[in-house]
């Protein structure tokens, strides 16, 4: 159904790209009409059908009514704020806690500049950026799990 362009292996530009490992995605099916008319509507309708099916089969119930006079002992944020909450909870100085929170996105912005991204997009060929990502993920998981524990066990997760 799609129109494919056959590669000309006698083309010196294509040979140079293939020698550098950059020509693998140069030829292929065009996005119009193959993807935009046939594949995308199926994916969109499938996503809508899954959402409607989940809403019908498992509706979310409304919880208990809020009581303003009964405050819980420890209020926890939503799960995606657990690492930041753990940083604020363990650092004694508020200014240092805010600076640590600001340093997280600043550090994430520097990751693409650690190695030459234009040369390779394969993560196995960029070991420094991959290592920074894996260590950052491990630290975020460690802080997130620690935020759910009491303060005396939060940094060691009760393991040591």
Swiss-Prot record:
Subcellular location: Plastid, Chloroplast thylakoid membrane
PROSITE patterns named in the record: CYTB_CTER
Topology class, membrane: Multi-pass membrane protein
Keywords assigned by UniProt, alphabetized: Chloroplast, Electron transport, Membrane, Photosynthesis, Plastid, Thylakoid, Transmembrane, Transmembrane helix, Transport
UniProt key word Hydrolase: no
Transmembrane listed as a keyword: yes
Chief place of localization: plastid
Pfam families reported in the protein's UniProt record: Cytochrom_B_C
Biological process annotations from GO: photosynthetic electron transport chain
Gene Ontology CC entries for this record: chloroplast thylakoid membrane
GO molecular-function term, one example from the UniProt record: electron transporter, transferring electrons within the cyclic electron transport pathway of photosynthesis activity
Membrane spanning residue stretches: 36-56, 95-115, 131-151
Similarity field: Belongs to the cytochrome b family. PetD subfamily.
Function: Component of the cytochrome b6-f complex, which mediates electron transfer between photosystem II (PSII) and photosystem I (PSI), cyclic electron flow around PSI, and state transitions.
Quaternary organization: The 4 large subunits of the cytochrome b6-f complex are cytochrome b6, subunit IV (17 kDa polypeptide, petD), cytochrome f and the Rieske protein, while the 4 small subunits are petG, petL, petM and petN. The complex functions as a dimer.
Name of the protein in question: Cytochrome b6-f complex subunit 4
Organism: Daucus carota
Gene giving rise to this polypeptide: petD
